[in-house]
């Protein structure tokens, strides 16, 4: 499947800015809103597998504050052997300083059994800017500093794709610079294109993740989403690849 190419082609075929009347209403203040999703994943990179994934994203707006929470995971087996397993969680709080400028603080943790890192955890803080902030189009960028701690591990994969041996290395930590960008475009009243980029760079590793998705509503609460995600670690253990990609098809429930 080539979901990433499909999404890019669809995005190029529509106007950059949709009419404001086509955009969904803004979320209410003081109430947790969000979405849960589950579906199918095709993974390539350190593991080539077909697996299932789940994710929960929630957000709360209270005056100048916005809090966002993420929890996700994927799991797959091949011939009775675990061939994909990843769990991650993140929290970010933004505080508006002006109509366009905000301060942020965030925490992130990932446990991936096939990435070459037993875990990666970071805390970051900095400033962001809302480039577009309408109901139809939202684009923001942020830059900051923080601390990244990770624990490398050397893996040997067996013929079925499972891990046959695992050797933990000492944990490492370093100061990091971080850059992120978040984009959302309502293409119509039922279709939304979104993209989220994160870069964390330090002496131990540079992590780059990007999540591109196209969601189409099939009812008031349900949507079908196709996505293309990448994760690149520039300094993985010698036996492992730098780049992992995920192609996803999910059923999404909004609340």
Roles of regions detected by a PLM:
Residues 64-68, 100-103, 135-139, 187-193, ...:
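Repeated loop/turn-to-beta-strand initiation elements of outer-membrane beta-barrel proteins
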Residues 27-42, 64-69, 193-195:
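Transmembrane beta-strand segments of Gram-negative outer membrane beta-barrel proteins
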Residues 36-38, 54-56, 89-91, 125, ...:
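Membrane-embedded beta-strands of outer-membrane beta-barrel proteins
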Residues 36-38, 69-71, 105, 125, ...:
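Membrane-embedded beta-strand positions of outer-membrane beta-barrel proteins
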Residues 1-31, 240, 255:
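Cleavable N-terminal export/targeting peptides
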């Amino acid at each position: 499947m080539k979901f990433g190419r499909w999404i890019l082609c669809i995005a190029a075929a529509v106007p950059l800015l949709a009419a404001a009347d086509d955009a969904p209403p803004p979320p209410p203040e003081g109430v947790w809103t969000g979405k849960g999703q589950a579906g199918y994943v095709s993974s390539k990179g350190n593991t080539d597998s077909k697996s299932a994934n789940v994710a929960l994203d929630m957000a709360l707006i209270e005056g100048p504050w916005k809090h966002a929470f993420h929890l996700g995971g994927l799991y797959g087996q091949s011939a009775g052997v675990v061939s994909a397993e990843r769990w991650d969680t993140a929290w970010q709080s933004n505080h508006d300083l002006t109509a366009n400028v905000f301060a942020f603080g965030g925490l992130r943790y990932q446990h991936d059994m096939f990435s070459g890192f037993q875990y990666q955890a970071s805390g970051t803080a900095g400033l962001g800017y809302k480039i577009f902030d309408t109901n139809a189009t939202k684009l923001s960028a942020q830059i900051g500093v923080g601390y990244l701690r990770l624990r490398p591990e050397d893996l040997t994969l067996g013929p079925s794709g499972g891990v046959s041996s695992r050797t933990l290395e000492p944990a490492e930590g370093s100061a990091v610079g971080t850059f992120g960008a978040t984009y959302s475009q309502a293409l119509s009243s039922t279709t939304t294109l979104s993209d989220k980029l994160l870069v964390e760079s330090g002496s131990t590793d540079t992590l780059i993740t990007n999540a591109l998705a196209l969601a189409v509503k099939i009812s008031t609460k349900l949507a079908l989403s196709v996505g293309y995600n990448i994760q690149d670690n520039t300094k993985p253990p010698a036996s492992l690849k730098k780049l992992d990609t995920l192609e996803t098809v999910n059923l999404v429930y909004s609340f």
